């Protein structure tokens, strides 16, 4: 993570999960014998906040969920602040997102380690923009019924609860290498969309701000 985000620039998160997990890792590092523990602890402290001692890092992550709750509302979310509700609502409303993500990845300069270059994130069915989370492929796509009978109960991996369950199964359940690989690939696709969802929401906010600024001028 430290290498991926570099030394400058704004870091976004959505809600508390990332901040909570990083603070848990900080506690683990404090009790560890890792050679670079101090460097990693300093990095974590620079991008997180803590309630117990009111610490807030100089490069603290910006919570897009708080931005949404304080400055934006879309009735399509039906009152939910979840990223799973905000993303499809933003896609339905934003012309920029519709024009950009209706194109294959190869045409919009978006790289992916888990989807093909021809993959299109925005799909329309019966004139309705589809929820990208619901368009994620089934975990065990193209498996036979006989093979499926031997597997765990996870069929779709498109929400945080299913992702945590799948990760737990991989850690503590005796399963075939084939099933473990299928769950691993599904988790990677889900996590990639979770990350891209924050990019899309930020792009949607930016579009709204540009329109409002132009109207003021």
Annotate each predicted stretch with a short phrase.
Residues 1-217:
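DEDD superfamily 3′-5′ metal-dependent exonuclease/proofreading module
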């Amino acid at each position: 993570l430290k290498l991926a985000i570099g030394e400058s620039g704004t870091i976004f998160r959505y809600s508390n999960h990332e901040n909570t997990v990083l603070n848990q890792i900080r506690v683990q590092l404090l009790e560890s014998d890792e050679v670079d523990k101090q460097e990693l602890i300093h990095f974590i402290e620079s991008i997180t906040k803590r309630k117990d001692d009111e610490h807030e890092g100089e490069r603290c992550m910006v919570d897009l969920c708080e931005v949404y709750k304080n400055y934006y509302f879309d009735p399509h979310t039906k009152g939910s602040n979840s990223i799973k509700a905000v993303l499809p609502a933003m896609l339905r409303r934003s012309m920029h997102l519709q024009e950009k993500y209706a194109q294959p990845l190869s045409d919009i300069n978006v790289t992916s380690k888990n989807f093909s270059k021809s993959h299109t994130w925005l799909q329309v069915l019966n004139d309705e923009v589809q929820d990208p989370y619901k368009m994620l492929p089934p975990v065990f796509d193209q498996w036979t019924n006989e093979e499926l009978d031997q597997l765990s109960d996870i069929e779709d991996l498109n929400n945080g609860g299913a992702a945590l369950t799948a990760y737990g199964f991989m850690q503590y359940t005796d399963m075939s290498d084939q099933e473990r690989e299928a769950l691993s690939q599904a988790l990677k696709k889900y996590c990639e969309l979770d990350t891209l969802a924050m990019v899309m929401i930020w792009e949607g906010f930016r579009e709204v701000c540009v329109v409002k600024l132009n109207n003021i001028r």
